Amino acid sequence: IPMTFHKLGIEYHLDTEVEWEYEYRIGLTTIWDSARLLQPGMARAGQMQCLSFGHTKTLEIGHGGAILTSNKADADKLRRMAYDGRDLSISPWQDQKEFSVGYHYKPSIEDCIKGLEMLASGELKDKESQRVTYPDLTGIKIWDGRV
């Protein structure tokens, strides 16, 4: 998540108050990078948790992810973003007069099936394999490739 913030030019601060293990909070926000945590009871009410289904992650579909939230308004905004800013209650979409920013981020049907099958069969990486010692990112310089 810090790399995405950097790419988008969003100022961010890392939460140095808690030890990072499996997940970490972005500054003093309600956003968590939970890419390495997927287990029953992990959801945090009133927070947003970003999951990853990439290589080496607990649910290793190979790419993609999800965002957990208990806030319906946030879920509605995120859903619109996933569908090119479209409001799925308006059909045909050409009748929609106002769009929000959208990204066309949604999993394929095949990836959904694969993920559901993996969850049902328990084909998940064990929690210990997800333990990572995060470096102190406050001292890492990100080179943006500009010369």
Task: Identify the function of each model-found stretch.
Residues 1-10:
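Substrate-binding/gating loop at the entrance of the active-site cleft, primarily
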Residues 10-52:
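Conserved PLP phosphate-binding loop immediately N-terminal to the Schiff-base lysine helix
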Residues 36-147:
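Active-site region of PLP-dependent enzymes
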